[in-house]
Amino acid sequence: MAKLQLGYKASAEQFGPRELVEIAVAAEAAGMDSVAVSDHFQPWRVNGGHAPFSLAWMAAVGERTERVKIGTSVMTPTFRYNPAVIAQAFASMACMYPDRIFLGVGSGEALNEYATGFQGEWPEFKERFARLRESVRLMRELWSGEISNFDGDYYHTKDAVLFDIPERPVPVYIAAGGPVVAKYAGRAGDGMICTSGKGMDLYTEKLIPAAKEGAELGGRDFDALDKMIEIKISYDPDPELALENTRFWAPLSLTAEQKHSVNSSAEMERLADELPIEQVAKRWIVASDPDEAVAAVKQYTDAGLNHLVFHAPGHDQRRFLDNFQRDLEPRLRALG
């Protein structure tokens, strides 16, 4: 099994760019192995929402830190972005911060794409997944340093060359919510990304077996695949605060269909705020006892997930990081 790693989710929907950089620096000081940032053009909330540009943030964090891996969780390199330009951006960052940059990719949400000019009906999963696969092929072709004349169904290059490429290609992590994409992650990804709180059967019966099948079909070492999961955790010694902190992230409790098709932050916020706090909290590990919190996390390592990226919902992230370093990190390291 791949090495146990502990990471921090930098919530770009909740914090402005400067504050989020400083929090990432604090996360490294608290012992985190990685920091992963979301990439939204529009946040899920109008009130209190933010949407700093992930690539600018990553470069700033690279300059301010020394060892943490830095990446997206996740970016959609298929609609508002040209994948060739994303390949250039990540190649440049990987040159500046060797072996510290990774690219996490997903198939996209309408919220970010309509705001930046997408027109027509939001594509079905089949097209979005096809675009994603094609974009990954194109980016890897460019990272080879060879001349690219890519002629795909969606993307094209003509005599394109990246003149600054890292010694080793940028690792690509594939976000998987179901077995179809998990199989692709196993076959073609350097890592797989999923999120917690969706019932253990999803991980043990669908995602992990599908990723393993994909790796076997591709003749790859499944154990070498970095299996990342965003752990939604609201840990605080104050149980009332641990529960109430989840409120800001009520949009996570909407269905995938709602999140993928809603095209305005105001509508997303309206739908989310109609949910009772008990339903909102179901997506989270809500705990004030460290042993209870770690026992809940252990389910995921037992399932075979090795890279745990912790997403804390509260507005006081330094409080969470202090609590994490004191109460949770020693117990979590013992799992590996």
UniProtKB/Swiss-Prot annotation:
Organism: Tsukamurella paurometabola (strain ATCC 8368 / DSM 20162 / CCUG 35730 / CIP 100753 / JCM 10117 / KCTC 9821 / NBRC 16120 / NCIMB 702349 / NCTC 13040)
Residues that bind substrate: T195, K198, K259, R283
EC numbers for this chain: 1.1.98.2
Domain of life the protein comes from: Bacteria
Gene encoding the protein: fgd
Catalytic activity: oxidized coenzyme F420-(gamma-L-Glu)(n) + D-glucose 6-phosphate + H(+) = 6-phospho-D-glucono-1,5-lactone + reduced coenzyme F420-(gamma-L-Glu)(n)
Function of the molecule: Catalyzes the coenzyme F420-dependent oxidation of glucose 6-phosphate (G6P) to 6-phosphogluconolactone.
Record-linked InterPro entries: F420-dep_G6P_DH, F420-G6PD/mer, F420_G6P_DH-rel, Luciferase-like_dom, Luciferase-like_sf
GO biological process entries: carbohydrate metabolic process
Keywords: Carbohydrate metabolism, Oxidoreductase
Magnesium found in the keyword field: no
Molecular functions per Gene Ontology: coenzyme F420 binding; glucose-6-phosphate dehydrogenase (coenzyme F420) activity; oxidoreductase activity, acting on paired donors, with incorporation or reduction of molecular oxygen
CDD domains assigned: Tetrahydromethanopterin_reductase (cd01097)
Protein name: F420-dependent glucose-6-phosphate dehydrogenase
